[in-house]
């Protein structure tokens, strides 16, 4: 490796990876998945040197195991169970599950294939590696760091001056500039403001005594599309039922938009409204979404002021403050803010993702509330899923 190791701890990932993986470990160990990398920035070129470094970093990642103190920390999290922690004592990333290639034009391909309980863990580690290699080898890293610090200084000043009054969690490890910069940003936001309530990064939560924050991602709902016995338009129902059975109302913030929020609300019935403490927005108009969710709570006699609206879609602090001012007297409001915390520099950040695309050989997809966010390698399946969603919505409207 030309660079120092990027991932040095298997805790250096989002909490929701462990949350989802625990459900899979207890209920769905028979599922296998395939994940595919995509860079959404037009014209992004990865050089041969970058490609070689990415592979060397993946090789290093696959030498890591959980340390005793890391397992003890996971065991201390209220809803993480002892048998799952003991499984993680045995688990490690397996290099054979990851395939990489580079086209002559510099397009990077990464595919992860394996048992879902193992394959799903690679996503955040790989995104951290790709992002840091790209920015360290493409730009003058020290110059980027100077611009990042200047911007962070202004953000902290704005919190301390009273310009921003909302609370938020840092959700930035997947697209961070570097490990060292996310560490510095989280430390300073947590110690120099009163507004940063935690982080999704389990390693940094442990290091700084912060609250680790996260529930589940789109892939958790998507995986039910690959189970033969589950109708496609009812996957939210089965996902929430398994989640509640695992966590019994703890760790209860539901993601609404995997196959559209309108369909989600058909399964977010009175029982689920009571079982989950809130919902997360990740696509579409956040104001229209919030109004729709509040009306849904009122429909079932739940006081929206007792429920959490968690916004996490491409936020900066100005957008978050506007949403907070709009909803603060009508519901609990919080924010998960990622790239704006961990990779706000003089250069445009990469918009990179690694998405679940097949489960047990069957295509799966995310629709979301923003059409451009849909990602599926099988367009026939994507259209079939859209028709299934539309049929149920029309039948039950």
Task: Give the predicted meaning of each segment.
Residues 1-235, 244-245, 354-397:
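Ordered alpha/beta subdomains of enzyme catalytic regions
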Residues 3, 208-397:
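Glycine-rich phosphate/ribose-binding loops and adjacent secondary-structure elements
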């Amino acid at each position: 490796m030309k660079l120092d190791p990027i991932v040095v701890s298997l805790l250096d990932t989002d909490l929701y990876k462990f949350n989802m993986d625990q459900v899979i470990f207890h209920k769905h160990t028979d599922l296998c998945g395939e994940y595919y990398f995509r860079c959404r920035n037009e014209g992004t070129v990865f050089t041969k040197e970058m490609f070689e470094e990415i592979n060397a970093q993946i090789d290093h990642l696959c030498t890591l195991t959980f340390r005793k103190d890391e397992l003890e920390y996971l065991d201390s999290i209220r809803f993480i169970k002892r048998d799952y922690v003991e499984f993680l004592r045995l688990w490690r990333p397996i290099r054979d599950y990851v395939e990489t290639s580079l086209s002559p034009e510099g397009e990077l391909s990464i595919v992860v294939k394996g048992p879902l309980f193992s394959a799903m863990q690679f996503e955040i580690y790989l995104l951290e590696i790709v992002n840091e290699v790209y920015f360290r080898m493409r730009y003058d890293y020290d110059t980027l760091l100077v611009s990042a610090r200047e911007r962070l200084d202004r953000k902290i000043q704005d919190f301390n001056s009273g310009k921003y009054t909302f609370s938020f969690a840092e959700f930035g490890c997947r697209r961070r500039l570097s490990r060292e910069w996310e560490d510095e940003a989280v430390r300073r936001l947590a110690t120099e403001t009163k507004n940063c309530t935690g982080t999704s990064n389990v390693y940094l939560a442990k290091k700084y005594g912060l609250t680790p924050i996260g529930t589940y991602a789109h892939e958790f709902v998507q995986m039910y599309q690959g189970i033969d016995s589950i109708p496609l338009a009812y996957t939210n129902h089965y996902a929430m039922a398994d989640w509640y059975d695992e966590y019994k109302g703890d760790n209860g913030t539901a993601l609404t938009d995997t196959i559209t929020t309108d369909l989600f609300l058909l399964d977010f019935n009175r029982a689920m409204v009571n079982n989950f403490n809130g919902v997360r927005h990740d696509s579409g108009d956040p104001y229209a979404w919030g109004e729709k969710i509040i009306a849904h709570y009122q429909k079932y006699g739940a006081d929206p002021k007792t429920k959490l609206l968690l916004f996490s879609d491409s936020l900066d602090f100005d957008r978050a403050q506007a949403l907070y001012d709009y909803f603060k007297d009508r519901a609990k409001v919080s924010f998960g803010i990622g790239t704006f915390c961990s990779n706000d520099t003089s250069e445009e950040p990469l918009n990179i993702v690694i998405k679940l695309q097949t489960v047990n050989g069957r295509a799966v997809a995310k629709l979301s509330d923003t059409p451009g966010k849909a990602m599926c390698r099988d367009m026939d399946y994507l259209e079939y899923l859209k028709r299934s969603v539309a049929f149920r919505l029309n039948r039950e409207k």
